[in-house]
Amino acid sequence: MATTRFMARKSTLASLIAMSLMLSPAFAEEAESEEAAEKGYAELIADLAAQEGLFNFYRNTDSGETMLSLREEQLNTPFIYHAQTMDGVVEAGHFRGNFRDTRLIEFRRHFNRIEVVTWNPRFVFDENNPLSRAAEANRSEAVLAVLDIEADDNGRVLLKADPLFKSQALHRIAPWANPNQSGPRFSLGQLSADRSRIARERVYDNNMDVVVDYVFLNEEPVVFGSAAIADPRSITISLQHSFIEMPDNDYQPRRDDPRVGYFTQEFDQMTNPEWAPWGDVINRWNLVKQDPNAALSEPVEPIVWWIENTTPHEWRDAIRQGVEDWNIAFEAAGFKNALVVKVQPDDADWDAGDVNYNVLRWTSSPRPPFGGYGPSLANPMTGELISSNIMLEFVFMSNRWTLGELFSSGAALGDYHNFDDAHMYCSHGHEVQMGHMLGRLASDQRMYDDIENDPILVQALRHLIMHEVGHTLGLNHNMKSHGLWDNEQVHDAALTQGVIAGSVMDYNPVNIAPVGKAQGDYYSYKPGPYDLWAIEYGYSPALDDADAEEARLQQILSRSHERELAFGNDADDMRAPGRHIDPRIMTGAMSSDPVAYAIDRWDLVNHEFGELLDKGREDGQSHQRVLTSANMLFGQYAGQATVVSRYIGGVYVERAYVGQTNDVRPYTPVPRDTQRQAMQALNNYVFAADTLESMQPVLAYMQQQRRGFNHWGNNEDPRPHQMILNMQRNVFNHILHENVLQRLSDTAMYGNEYSLTDMLGDLTGGVFNGTHTTVSQNLQIEYVNRLIGIAGLEGGSGYDNLSQAAAVGQLRRIRNMSAPRRAGDSVSNHYGYLHLLIDRAFEA
């Protein structure tokens, strides 16, 4: 009896254990998998909504779960993968239309699973070279995801799609940690797969788009972000994953060359013994003539641009003109009507994010990351362009301040051009907006209700569109093209005729005429000579014979040394202190004599400060226009100080090849007279005791319009001493940079006649010019502290020996200065403090 009861209990216990195992997640999942395997392909998709095309995509309309189906022949075959932000928050590096990632991926079968693999195709081996057998040595592919095969029959494999798309397997959405950034930073937190969702999918014959709303959770945020974020504990980023079939056409890649500026696909030729074993190709569209024998022919397939239906009607003509004017350049390459513009119908059944369409898109963001942005998608193997978008922000058309904290509040003059993807990011829209504000102020114009009556805005919009379209054609920035005209010619509209620089890809300031001079063109709104030349190189049809084609390309490139074809991109420009060497490759510069142009701009700003109270105030309005205009004027003044400073210690760079001209010299130090002219300009306009004295009558009116409690905790009074000192510091950051001081000595060995001692002597003379104001006293203390740091008297110094010695010499010179007779207490105290700083430094 006892045995029977024991056996009964044992049987019951076994049953409970079995039931618990069946109910456990692992066992249930295994059972479900076995059940699915038994069902087969047809049965698994029987009740699912289907979209068929490149891949087949299935969705359970009750649960929302998704599945993906591939043909067997699509396995081990490369596809182009592309990630694009549909909507996001700027704090996390996301914004609508942001092209984020393009790579090759393959779906590879490994027994009962599919591996999603990516690799870097840049390393190229000659198949006939025995080294090609070791082509995979010391390289790492990346397995992004592993997916179980749910069914496999009739030449197709079926996979669950949710694990692939509701994770960061294909693309990292959260920003990478930046080891160089100190202090707290904005964080998305952790991805929540449960709250994320596959929002929509579009399946076509040659591509598939899957849009996923990724939800990140951060229960204890440290940095809350802007008002664009409803609640920093839960943030949604909408991202589109695109899979594109490799193009199957007769596209012929074109090689890159350092003398012309295109975006590229880089290839290292691993078996090539040449000095520069690179096989880089440029990004460009596949344009083919309808009539190959005609000098000018329409393309078989033009580049079609769509104006998004969100675009205000009154802007559309200027936008269309900005796109179509590129056809002028394409005629130099033998194409007529290479670009065509259409308008997206209001009832269009396609989305502007669809990679099958090139769309000019408009947004008005709470925190605009740009004025214009023109990314493109290229085949990583060939450089063939496949798709593009242009994102434009309404803020470019407005009077809104977009550069962060106001300068009048003490904001430093940082390099707001910097961006994680510097080669793709374009901040030119910000420059154009500030220029538009200056142009309107200088001409005493208010905002027009009708764009046709606003010549500044029409030219600015056409220019910005041309600039961003240029990026989508494959073109880099060209920060060296501003020297097309001299300082007089650039203001002559009869001469410039819409071309004030060699390229629309430059970052030129708005071209406002000096006081008393007739106004010329405000912007370049037609392609310049560099643009025509670059398009000819990139898009003119190739010859059939390889040797003849190479000779043809060399003939085009042999003109690169011509002044109107000058080129230098972001990798050369000097916008950041101490970085790069050629002052002619610089944002914000204009004319072949940027120092003279800067002096004209400084005089203009001083003039406009004198008239700002008359122009900037309106009855019944706050002083917001005065405040914003004053900050804009100050930014223009400071920007030209930056431009001029780059000539000191500069070196002209020439990338012409050997034999291209009679005397090809890659590096030529800036002439002594030019460097001295730049230093004299800085001494007169930036380091002078009366610098920006014209701003003083405006200071009492630089009041920000109150909004709720937004200014709580911050004093609202302007800080002119801090403003001016920040500008002066920004100049010091360059001309006293360790790279610049050492280059002044190094270049003396190959032609520089403006020595380190000369430069510091002129600088000291400008800073201590005999006139005493609180502005000059502020500057002198800053300068002495800089010299002490260079000399390393109070700690280590990263400067070379010659620079340290020169700094000591200037400190001794300053120590021998004294307050003038009958100087007031302020001046006497000031010199006493300077002597104390120097004495303590030497004693240390």
Task: Enumerate the language-model features and the residues they cover.
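Bacterial N-terminal signal peptides
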Residues: A14-M22
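Sec/Tat signal peptide C-region and signal peptidase I cleavage site
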Residues: S24-A28
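Sec-exported extracytoplasmic/periplasmic mature domains
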Residues: E324-F335, S365, G470-H471, L475, ...
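Auxiliary tRNA-acceptor-end handling modules of aminoacyl-tRNA synthetases
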Residues: E29-T311, A329, A333, Q344-E452, ...
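The catalytic-center signature of Zn2+-dependent metalloproteases
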Residues: V343-T363, P369, Q459-P514
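Soluble non-cytosolic domains of exported or imported proteins
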Residues: T61, E73, N98, A276, ...
